[in-house]
Every structure is written in C-alpha cells, then in structure tokens.
Amino acid sequence: MAPMECVRRRNVGELVLRCAATLVCMLSLMLLVRDQQIAVQEVGVTSVTTQLRYSSSTGLVYLVYANGLVALYCFVVVLTSSFNGGSVMRRNKSGAWALFVLDQVLACILLSAASAASEIAFLVEKGAKKTIWDSKCIVYGHFCRMLEVSIATSFIAVIMLGSICVLSAKQLFQQYTHYARIVNMVKLKSTPNSLL
C-alpha cells in the first residue's frame, strides 16, 4: 500500500472516530439532562415530594459540561478538517501540536468528569453507612438506571478519545521522523565520495 494511501486511510479513520465521539458525548449529555424523577416519600404523617435531576449534584453538572465541551471540540475539528481535504489540521507542526495537546486535555477532563459521576452514582446506589445516608435508588430507580447508562457512554467516549490521542500523537511525531529522514539524506549527499 502506498504511503499516501495509508495517510488518507488514517485521516478518514480519525475523522470517523471523532464523529463517533461527538455522537456518543451528545448521547451521554442528552441522557443526563433529560434524566429526572419526582418521588413522593412518606415522612411521619405527611408526604414530601422530592425531585432528583442532574443539577442536584455538581459532579453531574461537571459531566454535562465536559460532554458538551468534548462534543463541540470534536465537531469543530471534524468540520474544519472536512474543509481542509480530510487532513485534521496537520499541515504544520503547530497545528499538529495544538490537536495533540487539546486531545490529551479534553480526554483527561472527560475522564475526571466520568469518574466523579461514577462516585456519585455509587453513593446514590449504595448509600454511605458512616454518614447515615441511605440508598436513593430504591426511590429513584429510573434516575439511577439512566445515570448509569449516561456514565457508561461517557466512558465509551473516553476510550474513543484515548484512541484519538494515540492517532494524533502518531501523526505529530511522524512529522519529526520525516524531518529527520530529510536531514539524514542531506547529510549523506554532502559527504565526500572519497569515504566510499
């Protein structure tokens, strides 16, 4: 296979992966934003109506913002690269470095948000006996199930972003190996023939 064909296939693969990450992040975001449940609990002789939604916890709000940020970033990169003929801003080293760093940073942000939301989901499901906080999934079962699906899709997006990070790192550092090959070729041409 020709080297240009490999580069083109890798660029198309990266674009498809970025599109998939955009869709998965949007799915996770929509599941979490639409996830709410109202429950009526008996407290003594009265009943109390309570509502649980993503805005009840700052960790879940963080996950919503992180998913939105990653989806927007991936969409913008796909959009700009589609106008650049499929190359994902790799024309120069500064663009490749920007993508490499942003991919890494956003993958870490989404991983930390999904991890924080996982801890919240664990506390909602299991409770915390030391603080006398009971499990809320008995009352808010639908909310808990939707929260788990949203967190799972966020971790799928993290895996996709990790794959994108590997691809962007490979493409960035291949520019340096290409440069090193050119320098070595120039050095070989400049050596005197008497050494041969």
Curated annotation (Swiss-Prot):
InterPro entries: CASP/CASPL (IPR006459), CASP_dom (IPR006702). The chain crosses the membrane at residues 12-32, 59-79, 96-116, 149-169. Residues 1-11, 80-95, 170-196 are cytoplasmic. The keyword Membrane applies. Its main location: membrane. It comes from the Eukaryota. One of its GO terms (cellular component) is plasma membrane. The keyword Membrane applies. It is found in: Cell membrane. Residues 33-58, 117-148 are extracellular. Keywords: Cell membrane, Membrane, Transmembrane, Transmembrane helix. It is a multi-pass membrane protein. Homodimer and heterodimers. Belongs to the Casparian strip membrane proteins (CASP) family. PANTHER family: CASP-LIKE PROTEIN 2C1-RELATED, CASP-LIKE PROTEIN 4A4. This is CASP-like protein 2U1. It comes from Pteridium aquilinum subsp. aquilinum.
